[in-house]
Amino acid sequence: MDEAFLQYTSLAYALTDIFGRGISISHTERLSGGDINKAYALILSNGKRVFMKANAKENAAFFTAEAAGLFAIASTGTIAVPHVLGAGTDDGEHVGYSFLLLDYIASGEKSASYWETFACSLAALHRADCTSFSSGKKFGFVENNFIGA
């Protein structure tokens, strides 16, 4: 896994590096979800929507671990996961924070075959060869992570 993207020192720098010069946040929407992190939809000046999770600056390891897990799941080719755009920390105006940027996936209507397709994909994930990101067995991730983070 290439973790170079995890070294962003500000959200503004991350957005410029990922999307190009002149890109800024036009609007931020707070999203509901988990209890541990804050979730946002960032609407950028180019019209693109990005999903951002945020937490205290000292909890940046949450997002490093989550990105590693998403890369591992994606490497199996069995089930769709959001694309990791970047992660890092920002000193903020008043308080520092850590962040994880992902592709924004809009909710939609489930097709008639949604649950069957999901079940087959989930089963394929559990059958996948995970030795490249496990401790050499069929279980256990190669690095510690955070359940529920």
Description of each model-found segment:
Residues 1-23:
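Juxta-kinase regulatory segment immediately upstream of eukaryotic protein kinase catalytic domains
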Residues 26:
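Short loop-beta-helix segment that forms the pyridoxal 5′-phosphate
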Residues 29-149:
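ATP-binding pocket architecture of kinase catalytic cores
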